[in-house]
Amino acid sequence: MVGVKPVGSDPDFQPELSGAGSRLAVVKFTMRGCGPCLRIAPAFSSMSNKYPQAVFLEVDVHQCQGTAATNNISATPTFLFFRNKVRIDQYQGADAVGLEEKIKQHLENDPGSNEDADIPKGYMDLMPFINKAGCECLNESDEHGFDNCLRKDMSFLESDCDEQLLITVAFNQPVKLYSMKFQGPDNGQGPKYVKIFINLPRSMDFEEAERSEPTQALELTEDDIKEDGIVPLRYVKFQNVNSVTLFVQSNQGEEETTRISYFTFIGTPVQATNMNDFKRVVGKKGESH
C-alpha cells in the first residue's frame, strides 16, 4: 500500500517534491475541521493506492502556513499538481470523480521514471506542458492523425497527399527547449529534413515554410529517429518558447508518405508557476468553492 504522506512542516515540503522527481506529485491542502476535506479523504487515500506511479502528499494549512501562502491557497481542499517541483495544474473542491479525472489526465502518456536516464539532469520531458487543444497539423491523414504521435503506443502520425507535414505545437506556459525526441519507423518513412520555427504570430502554410528562414534546421539520421535517439537543439535560441512549428520536408527513403511514431520536447518551464492558469478564489479561509 502506497498511501498519502503527510507533510509535517514547511521545511519538509520542497524535499518531498524533490523526492518525487519526474513523477506526478498530487498535493492536498487541507485544514482540521474542514467538512469537504474530511469527505474526500477516503477517496484521496484510495487514489494514492490506485495510482502508485504518482506521489500523494497532504499539507495542513495551519501546520504549514508558509507553504500554503507561497502556493496562494485560499480555500480547502485544494489539490496542486507538480512535476519536477514545477506546479502544472490545480483542482479545487471535494468532487472525487473530478479529481480522479484530473489525475488520470496527467498520468496519460506519463513519461515515466524509466526514461529518466535519457534526460540530462535539470531537464524534464515537456509532454505535460503541451496544450493539445492549441496544436495543429496540416496534411495529416484521416486514419493516422496528429494525436497519435503524442502517445507511446503502436499508433503513428502519417502524412496524406505527399511526404510533407506542417505541425504546430502549443505549450500551456513558456518553456526552454534543450532537445527533442523524434521517433519514426525504419522503413524509410521516418522524417529526415525538418525546419523548426518558434513563436509564430499566425499559422504558416507550406509555401511560407519552404521559403522562410527557420530557428533551426535538422537533418535527422536513422539513429536520431530510433527509440533511444535524442536530437539536440540550439539551446540559446529556444529560451522563451510558447509554440513550435515543425515543417517536415522529406523522409529518410524518399517514400510517398512520412510517418512519425512519437515526438516530445526536453527542457524546462521558464517559470515554476504559470499564474494565468490559476484563478485565485476569493472566500473565507476553509471555504470550498
Swiss-Prot record:
Q: Which domain of life is it from?
A: Eukaryota
Pfam name, any one: Thioredoxin
InterPro entries assigned to the protein according to its UniProt record, in alphabetical order = Galactose-bd-like_sf, PITH_dom, PITH_dom_sf, Thioredoxin-like_sf, Thioredoxin_CS, Thioredoxin_domain
**Keywords for this entry?**
Cytoplasm, Disulfide bond, Electron transport, Nucleus, Phosphoprotein, Proteasome, Redox-active center, Transport
Residues that bear Phosphoserine = 113
One MF term in the entry's GO annotations: disulfide oxidoreductase activity
CC annotations in GO: cytosol; nucleus; proteasome complex
Which cysteine pairs make disulfide bonds?
34-37
- Show the coiled coil region(s): none
Q: Which residues form the PITH domain?
A: 115-285
Compartment(s) of residence: Cytoplasm; Nucleus
Domain (Thioredoxin): residue spans on this chain: 2-109
Q: How does it assemble?
A: Component of the 19S regulatory cap of the 26S proteasome. Interacts with PSMD14/RPN11. Interacts with, and reduces EEF1A1.
General function of this protein: Active thioredoxin with a redox potential of about -250 mV.
Q: What is this protein called?
A: Thioredoxin-like protein 1
Species of origin reads Mus musculus
Q: Supply the gene name.
A: Txnl1
